[in-house]
Amino acid sequence: MRTLIALALLATPATAWEFTASPACMVSHETADGELKLSYDPRLPDPYAIAVTANTQWPDAPIFGMRFDGPSALTITTDRQIVDGPTVTVRDQSFGNVLNGLEFNATATALLGDNAISFPLNDAAPEIQRFRACIAAPIA
């Protein structure tokens, strides 16, 4: 029985938010429904990017949104998304509202057309703080 439980745990996606600082500042989180990656690379014209990869293809829709539910609830929308199969990406010069949404709320939901993927934020705050510290420091 213990072997089955161990195998089941290995087959499920990691539930923790993960921060890395190389080659660019990045924080990511994977669930059974998809993966969210936030990155900062000052070498790019639009240094901030958020990419949400679903288990299915995203629809072609005019507006992409991120809804943050919790104590500092907000919804952010844009028409600057790029859909590439199962991944929708948005790049910009600044992501202050996105960082605040991820750090200070309970869930983040990516919205495009009729599709929505939610990500729990219960362990996100420390990793978002590390991301903020990374973007404040120069990348070698």
Regions found by a protein language model. Name each.
Residues 15-140:
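A generic "folded-domain core" signal
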Residues 2-3, 81:
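Residue-level marker of intrinsically disordered, low-complexity segments enriched
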Residues 3-12:
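Sec-dependent N-terminal signal peptides
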